[in-house]
Amino acid sequence: MYNYKLNVQAEEDLARIFEYGISRFRIIQAIKYYDLIFDCFSRIAFNPFLFPEAFRFREGYRYCVCGVDTIFYRINNNEVEIMAIIWRQNY
């Protein structure tokens, strides 16, 4: 299993998603979705090569669809760096 970390952009994306969830769906649903995203982070860390490469986004990146969002990440040695969480992409 790899360790994972969020870069600044991904942290901002996560905050935006949570705030949107609260305003649109209320706190309980926002927390459930927030937990789902962290479950996706754990799945990525468990086997980061399981998910496809994101050639159209950036070379060396991979992605994982999580709910209506797409998590973009890259693998650096024994660590996964979560780069961005983007809303509704077609891949």
Stretches with model-predicted labels:
Residues 1-55:
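Basic, Lys/Arg-enriched alpha-helical interface segments
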Residues 40, 64-66:
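Generic recognition of cysteine residues
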Residues 66-91:
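Enriched for short, Lys/Arg-rich terminal
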Residues 56-63:
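Short, hydrophobic/aromatic-rich segments at coil-to-beta transitions
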